[in-house]
């Protein structure tokens, strides 16, 4: 008996040390005192352990020992989930010096432990130990890697979460990752021979999801037509000669398109293909003067920020106007940094005007990729994040989005209907989906996702509720609209799908509408089972954010800038 107990005690200590070894002891450049722990390490994404998937975990600011786990995936395919952490929903935003971190007061770890997985292998810090520069990926392989990685996370990396309620979440191409992974997890939970280690799987959230290729193309044609991107004459021509009098709301415009990778589509050169090309264009080359990820947001000038060029990756995300002189740069930098407290702000409110973009966060989205790339490619940061020498020996660099994966990726499923249908059919316990969309995104538009979910609901006999507004609690301003589909399957499990829009947000909802986004996700993960979620509720989110204390700093200008950024962030309504 004593020998058995000793063995159990040794095993517990071993497991705990396995999880705690990934604790980040000192995150370089952190300008505020974090009241939560962060972890960075690796999980095995295949059975023999040669595929190493990097993860970061930011524990909840509230009750990390009991709060649910929220798993986050960025899309691409080929984009790092650390982009989501440092550019959207995480607690750390990178200053334009690429060296320091200021606080995002609207981070999603307000009442959840958030796990970021860099998927698939080859993205970010994830790597193949046997094949340097391994950048081959496809939908089935990504799903298998994600399933194995999450299994390893619960069993080995952080076993304290094995019995915790958990949810999946992500955006963009995660609209394919998440339904496929959800399907695999449900199958695993139902498999008595090789069960998934955590059975407390309660929901999945997809933001601006790439879930139905043709549906998104057809809906973008309509969205663009009604957002002034075509003349009345050309639209009449399209209806007369392309849809030929058929209902344009249900017409398949995608038949006039072509693609080399089944992800990016252009007009096929036919008469109708040429007519719809201006409507389906998403400014992929960055030469059309608008941001495809947020139709109404601009970067007027990102050259004022002294960040290096990005390490590589993404198709043009943000375009900016012609650069300015070094004298102008210095002047504008001083106007940003030399607030020195609220007294000077009161003297000259004009210093608050942001001339770099049309947002109120100092154009963060215009330059954050460059700053984040610089930060995550520094040796001291990589050491703090427990990045192994084996990854460095492969001459890797961290990239926000790795184009070598994007260009080699094989899309196998151009619609996710089958996965939603499998999930809904096979669930044995209550489950909920949140399908949310910023309503001014052209890459994965809200209308295409709404039509897709309507079809899923019809296929599975779900009942439609009314479409109602939801409000941001801080000032009761309209935050968007929500509609719920619900019903029970053959196993008597209640399934709900909340179809929600976020007013004025684009592709990156957690950045574009920070306050409403964290209110939305907190209500989703904390709402009781079998209820219609009230996304306006303050029960799970306090909009009166209390900022963390600052760490001591020898640089008064850095602290001044940090304070000014806080002042701006706290005045965000949307």
Swiss-Prot record:
SUPFAM superfamilies noted in UniProt: alpha/beta-Hydrolases
One Gene Ontology MF term: serine-type carboxypeptidase activity
EC number(s) per entry: 3.4.16.-
Signal peptide annotation: 1-19
Cellular component, GO, one term: membrane raft
Cited Gene3D superfamilies: 3.40.50.12670, alpha/beta hydrolase
BP-aspect Gene Ontology terms: proteolysis
Active-site residues annotated for this sequence: 172, 441, 507
Glycosylation sites: 48, 163, 241, 408, 414, 426, 534
Name of protein: Serine carboxypeptidase ctsa-3.1
Biological source species: Caenorhabditis elegans
Lineage, opening ranks: Eukaryota, Metazoa, Ecdysozoa, Nematoda, Chromadorea
Gene that encodes the chain: ctsa-3.1
């Amino acid at each position: 008996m004593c020998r058995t107990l000793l063995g159990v005690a040794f095993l517990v200590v071993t497991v705990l040390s396995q999880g705690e070894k990934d604790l980040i002891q000192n995150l370089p450049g952190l300008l505020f005192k974090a009241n939560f722990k962060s972890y960075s390490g690796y999980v095995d994404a295949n059975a023999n352990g040669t595929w190493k998937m990097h993860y970061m975990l930011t524990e909840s600011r509230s009750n990390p020992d009991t709060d649910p786990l929220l798993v986050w995936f960025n899309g691409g395919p080929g984009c790092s989930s650390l982009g989501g952490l440092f550019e959207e929903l995480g607690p750390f935003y990178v200053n334009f010096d690429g060296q320091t971190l200021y606080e995002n007061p609207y981070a999603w770890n307000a009442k959840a432990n958030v796990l970021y997985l860099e998927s698939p292998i080859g993205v970010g810090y994830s790597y193949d130990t046997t094949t340097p520069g391994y950048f081959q990926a496809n939908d089935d392989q990504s799903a298998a890697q994600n399933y194995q990685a999450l299994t390893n996370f619960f069993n080995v990396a952080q076993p304290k979460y094995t019995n915790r309620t958990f949810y999946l979440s992500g955006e963009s191409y995660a609209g394919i990752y998440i339904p496929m992974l959800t399907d695999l997890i449900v199958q695993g939970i139902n498999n008595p021979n090789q069960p998934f280690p955590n059975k407390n799987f309660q929901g999945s959230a997809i933001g601006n999801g790439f879930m139905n290729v043709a549906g998104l193309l057809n809906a973008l044609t309509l969205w663009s037509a009604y957002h002034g991107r075509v003349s009345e004459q050309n639209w009449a021509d399209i209806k007369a000669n392309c849809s030929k009098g058929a209902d344009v709301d249900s017409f398949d415009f995608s038949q006039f398109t072509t693609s080399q990778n089944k992800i990016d589509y252009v007009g096929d050169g036919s008469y109708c293909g040429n007519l719809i090309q201006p409507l389906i264009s998403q400014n992929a080359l960055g030469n059309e003067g608008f941001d495809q990820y947020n139709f109404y947001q601009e970067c007027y000038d990102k050259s004022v920020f002294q960040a290096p060029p990005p390490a590589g990756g993404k198709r043009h995300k943000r375009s900016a106007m012609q650069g300015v002189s070094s004298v102008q740069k210095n002047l504008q930098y001083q106007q940003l940094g030399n607030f020195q407290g609220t007294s000077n702000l009161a003297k000259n409110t004009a210093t608050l005007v942001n001339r770099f973009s049309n947002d109120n966060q100092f154009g963060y989205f215009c330059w954050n990729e460059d700053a984040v790339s610089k930060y995550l490619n520094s040796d001291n940061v990589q050491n703090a994040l427990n990045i192994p020498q084996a990854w460095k020996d492969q001459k890797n660099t961290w990239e926000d989005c790795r184009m070598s994966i994007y260009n080699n990726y094989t899309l196998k499923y151009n619609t996710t209907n089958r996965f939603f249908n499998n999930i809904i059919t096979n669930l044995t316990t209550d489950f909920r989906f949140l399908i949310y969309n910023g309503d001014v995104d052209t890459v994965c538009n809200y209308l295409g996702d709404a039509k897709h979910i309507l079809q899923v609901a019809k296929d599975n006999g779900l009942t439609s509720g009314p479409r109602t507004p939801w409000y941001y609690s801080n000032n009761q301003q309209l935050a968007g609209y929500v509609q719920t589909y619900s019903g029970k399957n053959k196993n008597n499990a209640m399934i709900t799908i909340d179809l929600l829009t976020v007013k004025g947000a684009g592709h990156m909802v957690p950045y574009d509408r920070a306050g409403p986004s964290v209110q939305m996700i907190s209500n989703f993960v904390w709402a009781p089972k079998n209820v219609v979620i009230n996304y306006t509720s303050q029960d799970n989110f306090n909009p009166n954010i209390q900022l963390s204390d600052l760490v001591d700093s020898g640089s008064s200008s850095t602290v001044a800038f940090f304070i000014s950024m806080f002042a701006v962030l706290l005045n965000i309504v949307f």
